[in-house]
Design a protein with these regions (language model features):
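Canonical positions in the second alpha-helix
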Residues: 43, 77, 114-115, 149, ...
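Extracytoplasmic and endomembrane cell-envelope/extracellular-matrix remodeling and assembly machinery
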Residues: 1-83, 110, 141, 155, ...
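Acidic, polar-rich low-complexity tracts and alpha-helical solenoid repeat scaffolds
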Residues: 8-10, 131-134, 140, 144, ...
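TPR/TPR-like (Sel1-like) alpha-helical repeat modules
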Residues: 144-171
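Conserved small/polar residues in nucleotide/adenosyl-binding loops
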Residues: 177-179
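Alpha-helical adaptor scaffolds
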Residues: 60-65, 75-76, 81-135
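Short helix/loop segments within enzyme catalytic domains
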Residues: 117, 121-124, 138-139, 152-158, ...
Length: 179
């Protein structure tokens, strides 16, 4: 927003949709998440299929470490948006990864892969994917994802090191299968 918080509150002071949304965002930036959540829930009750309302409410819940609510509303955003972009899947992967549960990490990996299928040059999605793989114990895949990330940000030497490490780990795992 281009206005200070007090101006936003003064200008957008009714209960119409624009005012509720403006004050929800302004309060979110001010750290007044309770007011933001109240406004967003009112908007979602009026417009349950609006993906942008669901996305913002999910983001607010995530900022408050309420990962269950964050994923619920973000999933609603994904299901209601006309065309999902890579960032929606990346955010969902991030939300799921924070649960620190293997089944949620597996879901996170699926969402992050969807994100990377749309935009393989998103270095942060590769970073999140490496973290999710590590959380599930798939260290070779975590190292591969890290190599991709370093390649994208121009760290060729680190990229090569992680690619070699991933390759060696994959070879070791394959040799264990043949025993």
């Amino acid at each position: 927003f281009t206005h200070p918080h007090y101006e936003t509150e003064a200008v957008y002071n009714s209960t119409n949709d624009v005012d509720l949304y403006a004050t929800a965002v302004s309060n979110y930036f001010q750290g007044n998440h309770k007011k933001s959540i109240e406004n967003m829930k009112r908007l979602i009750n009026k417009h349950p299929s609006n993906p942008f309302y669901n996305e913002l409410l999910g983001e607010i819940y995530f900022a408050n470490n309420d990962y269950k609510s964050a994923t619920f509303y973000h999933e609603a955003a994904i299901n209601n948006i006309e065309k999902v972009n890579d960032l929606y899947y990346m955010m969902m992967g991030n939300y799921l990864w924070t649960f620190e549960e293997t089944n949620k990490s597996t879901e996170a990996i699926l969402n992050l892969k969807k994100s990377l299928l749309i935009n393989s040059e998103n270095a942060y999605a590769w970073y999140l994917l490496s973290r999710a793989y590590a959380q599930t114990g798939s260290i070779s895949l975590a190292n591969y994802a890290t190599a991709e990330r370093y390649f994208l940000i121009g760290e060729r030497e680190l990229s090569y090191e992680f690619a070699v490490k991933a390759s060696k780990q994959i070879e070791e795992n394959l040799s264990l299968i043949h025993i």
